[in-house]
């Protein structure tokens, strides 16, 4: 997510939790609150998709978009991969809900709002699973009672 200079963004991290900020990986050694005061691109650890979890087209698209956030040196290459994948998805998907979400994702990424695009993609995981005949992924609940996965 990009913090803008007009509004500070406050984040709370648990002990051991990681956050990716402008390509750097930080780990909290104890519960901590952070306030980002200027422009920064960040992604919380529980929103980071691992390569082995890119098992569906939308998860592969998410991974390409996430790389634009957490690997600034690869942003151009990841952006090209993302654009190519997105184009293929417009041809592959026939479902209006997913197509509308993909149009929004395209617009968000084009406007530099990659974090919001990631949220939009995650929101379509259940629909994609439904269309593929699989059960939607149910994210485990952490000890705090919050979902550890898809939607913040």
Curated annotation (Swiss-Prot):
The keyword Transferase does not apply. One of its GO terms (molecular function) is mRNA 5'-UTR binding. InterPro entries: Flagellum_FlbT (IPR009967). Belongs to the FlbT family. GO terms for biological process: bacterial-type flagellum organization; mRNA catabolic process; negative regulation of bacterial-type flagellum assembly. It holds the Pfam family FlbT. Has a post-transcriptional repressor function in flagellum biogenesis. Associates with the 5'-UTR of fljK mRNA and promotes its degradation. The keyword Transmembrane helix does not apply. This is Probable flagellum biosynthesis repressor protein FlbT. The gene is flbT.
